[in-house]
Amino acid sequence: NAPLGTANPLTPPTPVTVLPGGRPAYFFRKSFAWSGTMPHPRLLLTGILKGTVECYFNGVLVATETSRQTTGLSINATGLLPGANLVALKLIPAQASPDVVLDLAASLLDGTTSVAPALPPTLPGTVVVNEISYHARPTYANPAAAVAFADNPAEWIELHNPGTLPVDLSGWRFSDAIDYAFPAGAQLTAGGFLVVDHTQFSGTLANRGDRLRLRDATDALIDEVPYLDDGRWPELADGGGSTLELIHPRADRRLPESWAASDETGRSAWQTITYRATGAEPTGSNNPDIWHEFLLGFLDGGEALIDDVSVMEDPDTAKLQLIQNGSFEGDTIGLGAAKWRLLGTHKTSKVAAHPDGVGKVLHLAATAAAEHTYNTASTTLAGNRALNPTKTYEISFKAKWLAGSPQLNSRLYLNRAARTTILSQPALTGTPGSANGRRLANAGPACEGLRHSPLVPAASLPVRVSLSIADPDGLAEATLFYSLNQGAWQRTPMGGDGAGRYFGVLPGQVTGAQVQFYVQATDRAGATSLFPEGGPASRAIYKVGDGGTSAQTVRNKMRLMMNAADAAELHNPIHGVSNFRWPCTVIYNDREVWYDAKVRLRSAPFGRQGNRAGWNIQFGPEHPFRGVQTSIVIDGAFNMPKGDGTGWLENSLGPSVNEMLYQAIANRAGDIPATYDDVVYFQTPRPTEGNRRAQLKMTRFNPSYLEETFADGAEGTLFKQELIYFPTTTVDGNPESL
């Protein structure tokens, strides 16, 4: 990127030249010198424009633009010459207003788009795949009721005809993921829906992702959905009790943002869970009893409403209530609940309005599984009362399943009176045969292929941000938002190349500065979309300056970038065992980038801090690491021996790289399965932990490793042995504190 000028479109321009009124047109010229070569040069004009401008580059008309506010215009600059070049503008006032304003910044772009091409052409859309149930919720194990875990084979696809005429489906078929041929005479009425289920087609819809194609009688591709089970795709459709619903028939069915998990929250019913147990630990256990608490937690990601929580000692006689806040009526909606600790994977839980309109409830939300002393919702018993192993305790609460896992575990610390309840879920899932509940009046523009360049900019070097944008209504505006060091958001217009690729330029910054950005696109019907989808809550980040990483003599280099506040929370010792995943950006070998990856600390509590810290990074399946892995581990404990038995080249607490060498030898010599480890130089998200050489662990003992090692090794349930670690004090000695 080569800046030719600067402007801040948020600030109304101060007139430098006051133009005389009443003119039919105004003319401007700007010359600049250029040396060097560019394979695909483009000129980007961004700023404020009121009127119509004709742009001439070296005497050739290259673009015309009409605007009443901020604008972005990307122009083919193949006429770029060594030496002097001339940009000329002809500004024509709008007929409806005598005002003319021109305050544009120009940047020269290299125009490279090979890393992220424009979106493919829109599919015909005469009939669309409108809803998919590819992984119905299973039957969950419930030993108390003698129910074993069982997968649910039910699968179905819904087609929708959004047109005004019926469509003859004779000879049409599904291909790739499943095989199904529509019979002769099959019709889909105008505005109608048609469902094909697993009893009709051959093959299955893969739970981890598949490509579903619909072809007409001439074998032309009518629609295509390359769905996945996670990442940018709605995770709740993967056995979480929801289906994939298209948000609008004209939305691009190939993109994850065009789909949403069906909303099942209105279908589930309240239920009351009540059971009794003594205060004794399970026979043969030696669990700690230092804390006196009631705990709730999901065994996987899930959501439920909770109300009327009660733990009663001697329920038939003394009836002593031990829960201090079981109704949540004194709490503030949108915040945490008084006397409760909502931690780790359950940290997004909050008080909500009762769906019946009266009172308040706890919206218990888990991003992943609960654990024995953290990553749960917990509350200290009234008066910090210790449990009596000979007394009876009655535990009761109301629950209403909302989404995800229905496996809700309740217990008294540590593992007394423990029970996992399978919350009741609605029998019907999704909206087969009818309009989607998540359908929008109009979907915003489709965005794909976001990338900033250079990935690791030097000080003062402008950064180009580009992505592909498309919309059937046409694009009205694309705006690039950016924040410097978590400061106030600023904006700059983006310009298109006429082929669906849009560009914006961010100003250069000093070494060490960190910039977060996202794009807002609005179509001509007024619908808006953000990319990454979370907008300001997403994490597309770059840091200025190399930080010495490129000079390291390690083949693989990885940079993990987080907002400072997020990184501080990630490494906060109080929350050291949290498994909540924070959004981040990952750059690998300064060539590949992942925005909105997810990271948490890993290892046992004592291995999550200092020079032993490790990171578990999760990538979306739409862009796996090295084309295969959806999660990796960076093990900061790194030991490298000299190799001659005389000591270490690098030494810290933890395993040596010799283990990697032994695995590699065994794998090559005897085809013995290995966990595919490597060495990486890792740039940590903050200086406190220090950049370092580290072990890059890829498969570990995940399903891909088990599949290579054993026949059907990834099938069934994987059990993990876990040692019991527990805190012995709080920050201030108060048992209700952290």
Task: For each feature predicted by the language model, list its residue ranges.
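Activation on beta-sandwich/Ig-like modules and their edge loops
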Residues: 54-78, 83, 109-266
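Glycan-association/targeting regions that enable binding to alpha-glucans and other polysaccharides
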Residues: 266, 425-588, 592
